[in-house]
Amino acid sequence: MTGRLAVLVNLGKTWALLGGASALLGGVGWLLGGYRLFSIFVFCGLLAAMALYWYADRVVLGMVGARELVETEAAPLFTTASRIAARARMPRPRLYMIRDGHPRVLSAGRGGRGHALVVSTGLLGAAQPAELEGLIAHEVAHAARRDLLVQTIAGVIGATLLETSRAGGWFQRGLLFVLGPIASAIEHALLSPRREYAADLRAAALCDSPHGLADALLRLELANELVSFAGNPALEPLYTVNPFEERGLAALFLTHPPTVKRVARLRALDPDWEQRNEAA
């Protein structure tokens, strides 16, 4: 799929998602109170859809506890992000940090100036420059294709459904069994694993090498295997590598392909890599 076609497809998915959510609210209103409540619920749904389009990234940033960085705090990160964004002909993403000793990276927003890139303190302390460049390029590629727009809105809707059902009490726990699969179905219907392969391929081109991203993916995967991650699993699509354990409720929201397959595809872009690696 070409870049322009991918943008159009993702914009279509976004408006279908927002329209579907509004229609669902309208259906609830009709069941509860007929046409009068139907009109009110549809109107509220449209307002919520507009709010999601413009502010879903802020909701995500609040959920993960991110704060915006200034350039003096992480000058190399800003330099790398500016360089990669310029190569992709995109504005530099807004850069945020979460206090987490383990390497993690995620993005949220609409793309362009609405794109927020979040890194953990553990990633800044552990990643090599080429790895950091590869991860930034991967997320910029998502923003350029407007994958990020669909991922963010689907993630926020799913996360909100789960948070509502987790509020406590037997009724909310019952809702979890109903809303959990619904939120999962929404994400799987809109988010194909192919989007990750496409972003990986574009990132390799932006970096002139696939190996920085490949090494970074392995680093993130190893960290996930060593330490379990507590968070809202509906936000899984926003992370570069799935940080959640692949069991229980989190298993419903897996939209990333296996990391080992992603790394293998990246290494295959450099046919001589294995020979050079063995010689070294």
Where are these regions (language model features)?
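Short alpha-helix carrying the canonical HExxH Zn2+-binding catalytic motif
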Residues: 118, 128-145, 149-150
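Active-site-proximal gating segments in proteases and membrane effectors
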Residues: 89-114, 184, 204-280
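Soluble non-cytosolic domains of exported or imported proteins
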Residues: 190-193, 257
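Short amphipathic alpha-helical coupling elements at transmembrane boundaries
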Residues: 79-86, 134-137, 141-142, 159, ...
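Active-site scaffold of zinc-dependent metalloenzymes
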Residues: 105-129
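Hydrophobic or amphipathic, alpha-helical segments that drive membrane association/targeting
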Residues: 1-104, 160-173, 177-189, 197, ...
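Catalytic Zn2+-binding segment of zinc metalloproteases
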Residues: 140-159, 168, 211
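Residue-level signature of catalytic and energy-coupling elements of molecular machines
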Residues: 34, 57, 81, 119, ...
